[in-house]
Amino acid sequence: MSMVSEFKKFALKGNVMDLAVGVIIGGAFATITKSLVEDVIMPIVAFIAGGEINFKNMFLILGDTPEGVVMTYDALKAAGVPVLAYGNFITVLINFLILAFIIFMMVKMVNRLRRADEVVEKIAGPSEEVQLLREISAKLGNINK
């Protein structure tokens, strides 16, 4: 089998295609989550806290600062000053927690739907094949008596 045909067989398997779709949707979903945190949640947190909270400007300078450099994260990074950006980490952590919670809720909903389908199957009773076999068994039982 050639390398190209082997790759085609691998790439066209259902699981690989499902994974590719999941990765693409996951990337888009991460962008939505980032916007939710930065554009919706953080302004509400800032309002409740009584002022503007900009986590990006929460950092710790680890080295010497050159003369005339503005003390903002972007300016310090541009000047090559080592900076511990714990504020950015907080933002990324909030993004992750929201994303993890949403995915947890989605999995929980899918599991609930699967259980509901299983209950419907159990309530529906035996399949036609089982009913037919029971009828045949009953008739054979009557013949043998």
UniProtKB/Swiss-Prot annotation:
Channel that opens in response to stretch forces in the membrane lipid bilayer. May participate in the regulation of osmotic pressure changes within the cell. Coiled coil: none annotated. Keywords: Cell inner membrane, Cell membrane, Ion channel, Ion transport, Membrane, Transmembrane, Transmembrane helix, Transport. Disulfide bonds: none annotated. InterPro entries: Mechanosensitive_channel_CS, MS_channel, MSC/AndL, MscL_channel. Pfam families: MscL. It is found in: Cell inner membrane. Belongs to the MscL family. It comes from Psychrobacter arcticus (strain DSM 17307 / VKM B-2377 / 273-4). PANTHER family: LARGE-CONDUCTANCE MECHANOSENSITIVE CHANNEL, MECHANOSENSITIVE CHANNEL MSCL. GO terms for cellular component: plasma membrane. It is a multi-pass membrane protein. GO terms for molecular function: mechanosensitive monoatomic ion channel activity. This is Large-conductance mechanosensitive channel. The chain crosses the membrane at residues 10-30, 41-61, 87-107. Gene3D superfamilies: Large-conductance mechanosensitive channel, MscL, domain 1. Its main location: membrane. Homopentamer. It comes from the Bacteria.
